[in-house]
Amino acid sequence: MNSKIFAVLFLLAFLSCVLSDQYCPKSSITACKKMNIRNDCCKDDDCTGGSWCCATPCGNFCKYPTDRPGGKRAAGGKSCKTGYVY
């Protein structure tokens, strides 16, 4: 009996971990003028309060993760600089 309860609890815990994936939110903006593109972050460490560095057409911004896919995390790298990229 105890092994059945353990198996059910284990399965529920496993499913909650699998189903709780987090993503950057999808941007509602599809295009941005080059002179308006700026990066507030280059990597997640640049963000505070559990937010992630997410890429948008207007640059990288700190956003809180969501459970809906569609957004894109910022790639960062040595060439990424904060501020206006124009």
UniProtKB/Swiss-Prot annotation:
Lineage: superkingdom: Eukaryota
Protein location: Secreted
Annotated S-S bridges: C24-C54, C32-C58, C41-C53, C42-C80, C47-C62
Functional summary from the UniProt entry: Has antibacterial activity.
Official protein name in the record: U15-lycotoxin-Ls1d
Record key words, sorted: Antibiotic, Antimicrobial, Disulfide bond, Secreted, Signal, Toxin
SUPFAM superfamilies the UniProt entry points to: Elafin-like
UniProt keyword annotation of GTP-binding present: no
GO annotation terms (biological process): defense response to bacterium
One GO CC term, this protein: extracellular region
PTM note: Contains 5 disulfide bonds.
Protein family (similarity comment): Belongs to the venom protein 11 family. 01 (wap-1) subfamily.
The WAP domain, residue ranges: 21-66
Main location: secreted
GO MF annotation terms: toxin activity
Signal peptide as annotated in the record: 1-20
Tissue specificity field: Expressed by the venom gland.
